[in-house]
Amino acid sequence: QPEEPRCRETPETWSGVLYIISVRNTEVLFTISSSSYDRTEQKIKITMVKSMTNQPLKTVLDDYEKRIRYCKNETLEGELPSFGVPENAHFDGPVETLGAKIAGLGVTVAHYTIAERGFSYFTYHPLGDEGTQCIPITNSIATLD
């Protein structure tokens, strides 16, 4: 793996578990979600499977082709997210392995931070030798308002 994998986008399609931690003033959100991403179909589906803060569990399907967010029934703005490392993120190297360091059991991860109006921490699994694509593992965001 490169010293600093700087992936800008995820592969065309992927699915997995995404951990989201968000802190805003006195509100704390921690959810575990089953997620799927499809750039060809322009869809992102996130199904909350567990909430540590008694948030109601829900499924949200963002259809960027039709510009509709199902579940919340609102119009989508912008483009389909690339889920890559944000441009202004700082690499907190080195790349490391989570779990067992035995072939097929551990996962290689790279950590990045952003310190703007709070603190954001992102963990990605870089793919391939170049590290130009990645899959998000965790997003942790603390916002100071």
From Swiss-Prot:
Molecular-function GO term, any one: carbohydrate binding
Function (record text): Lectin with affinity for N-acetyl-galactosamine, carragenan and glycoprotein porcine stomach mucin (PSM). Has metal-independent hemagglutinating activity towards erythrocytes from rabbit and human. Hemagglutinating activity is not inhibited by D-galactose, D-glucose, D-mannose, D-fucose, methyl-alpha-D-galactopyranoside, methyl-alpha-D-glucopyranoside, N-acetyl-glucosamine, N-acetyl-mannosamine, D-fructose, alpha-D-lactose, beta-D-lactose, D-lactulose, D-sucrose, fucoidan or glycoproteins thyroglobulin and ovalmucoid.
Record keywords: Glycoprotein, Lectin
Subunit structure: Probable heterotrimer consisting of an alpha chain and two beta chains. The alpha chain can probably have different glycosylation states.
Residues bearing carbohydrate: 73
pH effect on activity, per entry: Optimum pH is 6-7 for hemagglutinating activity. Activity drops rapidly at lower or higher pH.
Post-translational modification: Glycosylated.
Record note on temperature dependence: Thermostable. Retains hemagglutinating activity after incubation at 60 degrees Celsius for 1 hour. At higher temperatures activity drops drastically.
Designated name of the protein: Halilectin 3, alpha chain
Keyword hit for Glycoprotein: yes
